[in-house]
Amino acid sequence: MNHHLPSRPARSRQSQGLKGNLRVPGDKSISHRALMFGGLASGETRISGLLEGEDVLRTAEAMRAMGAQIDRRDGTWTIRGVGNGCLLEPEAPLDFGNAGTGSRLTMGLVGTYDMTTRFTGDASLSKRPMGRVLNPLREMGTQVLQAEPGDRLPITLRGPKHATPINYRVPMASAQVKSAVLLAGLNTPGVTTVIEPVMTRDHTEKMLSGFGAAIQIETDKEGARHISIQGQGTLKGQVIAVPGDPSSAAFPLVAALIVPGSDILIENVLMNPTRTGLILTLQEMGADIELLNRRSAGGEDVADLRVRSSALKGVTVPASRAPSMIDEYPILAVAASLAEGETVMLGLEELRVKESDRLSAVAEGLKVNGIDCTEGKDTLTVRGRPEGKGLGGATVTTHLDHRIAMAFLVLGLASERPVSVDDQSMIATSFPEFMDLMTGLGAEIEDRD
């Protein structure tokens, strides 16, 4: 388990033009859901391109513990599901490691079953708030038998004999909360409705519909989305090809923009409009990103991205864009560090409850490496240095956060002095091939003894 491994420092240094073609691992959001819905569906589900990072593998283990048969052969995962309403009570606690998505979605999935389920996680996950998911489940009849103060892990849930459908307005822009309520609705009689004032990533609705769930989506005159699911229906196994994760593609993409003389092609990247906030922002900053071979795969938009080094200019990123790029702010802050002028990022409160307090971790890493930035309650302002002059030379504390580690290793590729991170081991949670893919493009990244 990654949270018991010794730390492994790494260092990156100024690199010459990055060149080559690459594929990033499968999308994390879709991978978690493909395993969950396949494990719940009747019949067989086959998945290719699954992200085989630690977080997703924890979801596979959880579904196995509740009765799904899951096998991997030659890169294809085959699942024989239990059928909707037929999950088995797990004998041991479900250990989700560092996986926020896996743990929160599974709480929704099991919360309306008449059984007891215990959730545990690593030190980082155990600091993250789970009340946002538990509150709607309580309304549906779920009992929280045990939790740490502030509704934190470890948590024990007991589902009701008869769950109650609810209409739930999500209090913050969170695809995980929306998804947890919809998954709880799968095993609840009647119609469960989630109302989201701001649209968040919509993989749950799209994929559940693809598996045969009765889902209706309407937008009211205020622009809020009402997503309704008819409970206790049948899900049928599917064949799924998982596209590349845009949140992982963000790292080589920004590296190519800021390392002079770079020209790379990132193939098969998910371009779902609820996930493309970073690309839109970088294009506003002057990034040369060309979308090639645009196509649809399994109901999702996919494209190849040709990225060439670019002179970037600072912009203001509106709060309304945060849900479509919540995982990309660390790497956007790195791009802003090499841009001319000031970049202002608004509406970042959600970053305070990620794998780390991601907002303060980013600001701290920028400052120790000579970057002029100001951290507000929910804002970050970065004043860039286009040539990377005087930047680097420090070690960044990653706080067990994979995206902090990757973002600052990218910073070092365009800084005057090397940048170190205190630990790279947790990169395996989302992007196990990161080091190999980056060095394959010509990035100077190495283990540091």
Swiss-Prot record:
Gene3D superfamilies: Enolpyruvate transferase domain. CDD domains: EPSP_synthase (cd01556). Pathway: Metabolic intermediate biosynthesis; chorismate biosynthesis; chorismate from D-erythrose 4-phosphate and phosphoenolpyruvate: step 6/7. Signal peptide: none annotated. Pfam families: EPSP_synthase. It catalyses: 3-phosphoshikimate + phosphoenolpyruvate = 5-O-(1-carboxyvinyl)-3-phosphoshikimate + phosphate. One of its GO terms (cellular component) is cytoplasm. One of its GO terms (molecular function) is 3-phosphoshikimate 1-carboxyvinyltransferase activity. Monomer. Belongs to the EPSP synthase family. This is 3-phosphoshikimate 1-carboxyvinyltransferase. It comes from Chelativorans sp. (strain BNC1). The gene is aroA.
